[in-house]
Amino acid sequence: MAERWTKMVGFLGAAANWTIPIASFMNLKNDPEKVDPIMTTTLAVYSAVFMRWAIAIYPPNYWLLGCHVANEVAQLTQLGRYGKWKVFDSKQESDKQ
């Protein structure tokens, strides 16, 4: 019973965690200036830590690992977009003024 309960809770946690990368992927169409670099960095670090945790526990939680891999990709993509905007696009906008 305890193992079944643990697996169910692990699955539900991973399922709920999918809302983070889904939201991030949906925001890829928004302006990069709206990206919060502190929160995005925090989410990237969070996912990196929990990717490791998801495979370190017994039994490994591959659902959670997949979720955090997707979130890591999403957050790093957002940070890349923000960095590109900050270095190139915002400088061009200030030069125009």
Swiss-Prot record:
- Provide GO CC annotations from the record: mitochondrial inner membrane
Specify the protein name.
Probable mitochondrial pyruvate carrier 1
Q: Where in the cell is it found?
A: Mitochondrion inner membrane
Q: Could you say which residues form the signal peptide?
A: none
Q: How does it sit in the membrane?
A: Multi-pass membrane protein
- Belongs to which family? Belongs to the mitochondrial pyruvate carrier (MPC) (TC 2.A.105) family.
By its UniProt entry, which InterPro entries does this protein fall under? MPC
- Name the residues that span the membrane: 9-28, 38-55
Write down a Pfam family by its short name.
MPC
Which one GO biological process term can you cite for this protein? mitochondrial pyruvate transmembrane transport
